[in-house]
Design a protein with these regions (language model features):
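Residue-level hotspots at or immediately adjacent to binding/recognition sites across diverse folds
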Residues: 1-242
Length: 242
């Protein structure tokens, strides 16, 4: 069973409270006054913004990312939430679509190729070098200390230095890349809206397409304990054996 812990209208109130507190404390965050104005507008319009991604570090600690830099954090298993948006170093408040935990670091990615890296357990998310200029939908550790980011129109970048610089990986597809997972074997699986699945056996340095193209747009993938890869797309759920 499921129990609602937080909705967008509540998040707007939390955002307003955090922004007002930051302004009152003369916060150095340049986005605090803008956050106050935006939260007041959203509350007046009764307009909640969506959550887009979640990362859980333990049964108690989690961070949720969303539209317009919306970020919420819980340290008690979701009993209470705090707005964490001003801890994302993005005064223009871009959408945040995905995240990855790589070693002790947390990466968050979003619009305009923006990548944020937390080295303090999620307390702060300064920007690192952007990975291109198009929207990024997700990130994944490569298993050797590197990180991949992927997104719109076949965008795929790899960094081996914590996001200080990025190398573009040329792919034969211009479809949006939607998900990436690490298989039990250590290989990396990359999925796209075109129905093509790519696989890497060298920590994400190169990818090859699997022979069969699925007859649907792929939005997410996960590997079951028995090794089956479960694909979710616009036509339902499909199990694949590797």
């Amino acid at each position: 069973s499921w129990q609602l812990q937080l909705n967008g209208l509540q998040a707007n109130q939390l955002t307003l409270h955090a922004a007002q507190l930051a302004v009152a404390q003369d916060s150095q965050s340049p986005g605090a006054p803008l956050a106050v104005a935006r939260a007041n507008h959203l509350i007046a319009q009764n307009d909640p913004k969506p959550f887009l991604s979640l990362v859980a570090f333990s049964p108690q600690r989690a961070i949720v990312f969303g539209a317009y830099r919306l970020t919420m954090r819980t340290n008690d298993g979701g009993k209470t939430w705090a707005d964490w948006s001003l801890n994302i170093a993005d005064p223009l408040s871009h959408h945040l679509y995905g995240e990855a935990v790589v070693g002790h670091d947390i990466y968050a990615v979003g619009e305009a190729g923006l990548v944020f890296r937390s080295k303090d357990g999620g307390d702060s998310f300064p920007q690192v070098a952007p990975a291109g200029s198009t929207t990024l939908f997700g990130a994944l550790g490569t298993g050797d200390g590197g990180v991949l980011v992927y997104g719109v129109a076949g965008t795929l970048y790899r960094s081996s230095n914590g996001g200080a610089s990025w190398v573009a990986i040329n792919m034969p597809s211009s479809a949006n890349f939607t998900d990436a997972i690490t298989l039990n074997s250590g290989a990396i699986l990359l999925t796209g809206e075109s129905g093509v699945i790519y696989i890497s056996h060298d920590h994400g340095n190169s990818f090859t397409a699997l022979p069969a193209r699925l007859p649907m747009a792929i939005f997410a993938a996960a590997q079951a304990p028995d090794g089956t890869v479960v694909i979710a797309g616009d036509r339902g759920i499909l199990p694949l054996k590797f």
